Amino acid sequence: MYDFIAYRIPNQNPVKKVGKFKTFKDFDKGFVISNFDQSKTYTFESNELSFEQEFIPHFLSNEPHCISKETYLNFGNELLELLKSNQVQKVVLSRIKKTSFNSQLMIERFEKLCTAYPKAFVYLISSTHAGTWIGATPETLIRSIHTHGFSMALAGTKDKKNQNSWSPKEYDEQQWVSDYILETLQLGGQKEIEQQG
């Protein structure tokens, strides 16, 4: 079986490729995926096969642990108490909900995301190493122009109809993201960093 990538850079045409993700140490350019702690990193090497004819999504054999709605709500109540007592400042609670779907519609879903979000980076990645992922994000992780790199700290969402100003909580959340990106760049050896906004 082959690995697959499909991605669309904002306001450009989608790219769809068949190939293999391979482990690497250094690279000049390419499509890269990594696990959360960066202990496993892969770069994509494409071939000339047809994406649409060859696409069979990969699924990992180790399913994530799913909790019940009741357990999730109990965790939520415990976290609310921690927030009220200022023992924690920021918490993101999520749960995995298992549902069935037709995996052969993945390409169609990718194309719908491209149409719905023309200014977002849209991706469909299917790898024996990571499983299958699909999504769209407006956030620019890294963009380079000549010898300069640019990143974006983006936190919080707001309804287009709600034109009220941001709350102190939303400003704090934005600052946490900005601080994290800055710290990560500094740990990576970046010395000259200019912040705006």
Question: What are the residue ranges of the model-derived segments?
Answer:
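An anion-binding catalytic pocket shared by soluble metabolic enzymes
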Residues: 1-12, 26, 95, 100-176
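Intrinsically disordered, low-complexity boundary segments flanking structured domains
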Residues: 20-23, 78-79, 108-112
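Divalent metal-dependent hydrolysis catalytic cores, especially in the metallo-beta-lactamase
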Residues: 91-93
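Contiguous alpha-helical scaffold segments within structured protein domains
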Residues: 51-70, 74-77, 100-101, 152-197
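An N-terminal, globular interaction/scaffold subdomain
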Residues: 11-54
